[in-house]
C-alpha cells in the first residue's frame, strides 16, 4: 500500500531505506527512522485499537510514553511476543509484525463496538463489581471475558530465544532525561568532578533540540 499521508520531504527519516512491516495481517511500507506510529499514520491507518469496556474506536493520540491508545502486541512468532508496546515508542524495523490487542473479528469491525452506542445506559460505571458477583462459582468464566474486553496484551507461552545486554554501574549524579535541561545539568555536574549518568527513554540524546 502507498504511504498516502506521507510528506514528500522533511523529518528525520531516511527515505532511501524502505522497510516492510505488518499490522493486523496487512502489509505496509515505512522508512528507516520511523516509529511504528508514524509509519501507520503515513499509511492512513487511523483505527489502532478499541477502548476499554465500550470498545469505541481509538487512534494515535500522543507522541511518546504518554500514548493511551496505540498499545499493541509485537512479535512474529509465539516465542517473540511482546505485549503492550506503545506504537509511539517502537522503532520500525524490517519484518516487524504488530497486532491490535482487542477487536473481534477485527479492530475496524468490532462486534463489541455496539456497546459503545448503548453501553452508557446498560453498563454504568462500576457495574461489573455488582453484576458478576453471583453465583461465585461462575467468576472464572466471567473473568475470562472481562479480561478480553480490557484489551490487555498476552504474554508468550514459549521461552524467549533472545539474549540481552546489561551493565552494573555507579555514579554520583543520575540525570533522567537527555533534553536541553538534562544535558546542561549533566555538563555542569561533570565539570564539578562528579561521575554522571544520563538516562533517557529515546534512542538518542537531544530531546526538543532534534
Walk through the language-model features, giving the residues of each:
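Conserved active-site and cofactor/substrate-binding residues in soluble primary-metabolism enzymes
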Residues: 31, 35, 184, 191, ...
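N-terminal glycine-rich anion-binding loops that anchor highly charged ligand groups
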Residues: 13-15, 198-203
